[in-house]
Amino acid sequence: MRVAFFGTPLWAVPVLDALRKRHQVVLVVSQPDKPQGRGLRPAPSPVARYAEAEGLPLLRPARLREEAFLEALRQAAPEVAVVAAYGKLIPKEALDIPPHGFLNLHPSLLPKYRGAAPVQRALLAGERETGVSIMRLDEGLDTGPLYAVWRTPILPDEDAVALGNRLRDKGVELLLEVLERLPELTPRPQEGEASYAPPLSKEEGRLDFGESAEALYRRHRAVQPWPGSYFFHRGQRVKALRLRPEPGEGEPGVVARVGPEGVVVGTASGLLLLLEVQPEGRRAMPAADWARGYGVAPGTRLGQV
């Protein structure tokens, strides 16, 4: 089929790569270049870089309602468009152009976790199960009817990166199956109570030791790779790069013990073992080395700004 692809982050690149091996990608649409790095120089998105490297037709419109973009989409004459983490709602003027509409690969069990951060929000909420949905876009936020759904348990130590990649990879399989049979398929309306998954804020990475160790571990897994989890010590931000819950009890925010494996901190329920950290302005280091260098010992209180 003639396919237009809409996507932006690195997560979406394997979707585009799989599509171009089975179908004719007639247009790639990604978000405009954004400032990146220390110099804040405009840089293309990962999807745009891939499209340029592979010689695929590429557009980076600021607004999808612009007539110049809509005309370019018409001229590309896609039979269907595929969306994977594009980052903007597609207006009706564009939705109506491909004869078979727009398909969206969404990593949740719709109608649960509509929006930008479904994987992260499912982890934060402590969901035991999630999945991926292939849907037909309408004008709403992930409200369109479903072509295919795949369910899976969330593995105990999966973070947002690993879970998101696993859901994407299965989603690619589903997407290709749907495209093979698209003319004969009829999508079904979403059923059940809807929930929403807004983007994460930087503050949501902060570890509050007044929560349980299990909740803190869920938070740590959910906020990878951005914003990452962190806490404060003596007014400085410390990134928590690796951690895990431990059995036992301790006073929330107070170091219970320090050993070769790391720093054990009390929480509202259970203990949290810090394995690797990165103090503000410093390199990553084992938590035990950080404790020695920064005077962290049993009885030290963490988490205070």
From Swiss-Prot:
Q: Does the keyword Protein biosynthesis apply?
A: yes
**Ligand binding ((6S)-5,6,7,8-tetrahydrofolate):** S108, L109, L110, P111
One example of the protein's molecular function in GO is:
methionyl-tRNA formyltransferase activity
One family name in Pfam for this protein: Formyl_trans_N
Please give the GO cellular component terms listed in this UniProt entry. Answer: cytosol
- EC number(s) per entry: 2.1.2.9
UniProt keywords (A-Z) are: Protein biosynthesis, Transferase
| CDD domains the UniProt entry points to | FMT_core_Met-tRNA-FMT_N, Met_tRNA_FMT_C
Can the keyword Heme be found in this entry's annotation?
no
Which reaction does this enzyme catalyse, per its entry? Answer: L-methionyl-tRNA(fMet) + (6R)-10-formyltetrahydrofolate = N-formyl-L-methionyl-tRNA(fMet) + (6S)-5,6,7,8-tetrahydrofolate + H(+)
Q: What class of enzyme is it?
A: transferase
Q: Which HAMAP family match?
A: Formyl_trans (MF_00182)
Q: What does this protein do?
A: Attaches a formyl group to the free amino group of methionyl-tRNA(fMet). The formyl group appears to play a dual role in the initiator identity of N-formylmethionyl-tRNA by promoting its recognition by IF2 and preventing the misappropriation of this tRNA by the elongation apparatus.
Q: Which family does it belong to?
A: Belongs to the Fmt family.
According to UniProt, the name of this protein is: Methionyl-tRNA formyltransferase
Q: Which organism is it from?
A: Thermus thermophilus (strain ATCC 27634 / DSM 579 / HB8)
